[in-house]
Amino acid sequence: TRQHSGNIVFVSSDDYRKYHPRYGELQAAYGDDAVLHTQKFAGKMTEALIDDLSAFGYHLIIEGTLRTTEVPLRTRDLLRSRGYDVSLNLILVRPEVSYLGTLKRYQQMKEIGLTPRMTPKEHHDLVARSIVDHLHTLYEQDAFPEIRVYNRAGECLYDRQKTPFRDPSELFREEFSRDLSHEEC
């Protein structure tokens, strides 16, 4: 933050679901499935914030799932048109560990009195399955000159600047297909 003079905003669509005009009503009616009914609203809020904040020159860290390639490409194009340097940074986590993390987050939010957000397993698994192919596509298209992959401990596992001829999606393929260690089970 120091190098950007505190001018950094973290944008995550999950943070905006609670501002849906019918959020309480949707929570009461659908419970854990309310997330499905606030998804479109949260996405529109995220796009509007990215548009407004980038117009004012804020540095942005945008959280996403890479469920598609269209959203990151559209965001990249908008930001580049406004003079931004854009990079793609990913955190490599096995699908099983990732889904367990969503369950833990749900429980923790419930325990501290926040409205928890349940991630449907089918949706989680769809995203986990598609991330490898979407990352491969973005790499092949040279869509982002800077791509980095980190583990949850913050260690950089891949940096396109250092290994430009290695497809980062291979890291995900390898990690997703290896046997779980005894400690992970």
Label every PLM stretch briefly.
Residues 4-77, 114-118:
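Conserved nucleotide-sensing/catalytic segment adjacent to the nucleotide-binding pocket
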Residues 4, 82, 141-143:
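Short, structurally constrained coil/turn elements
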Residues 66-109:
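ATP-dependent NMP and nucleoside kinases share a basic, alpha-helical "lid"
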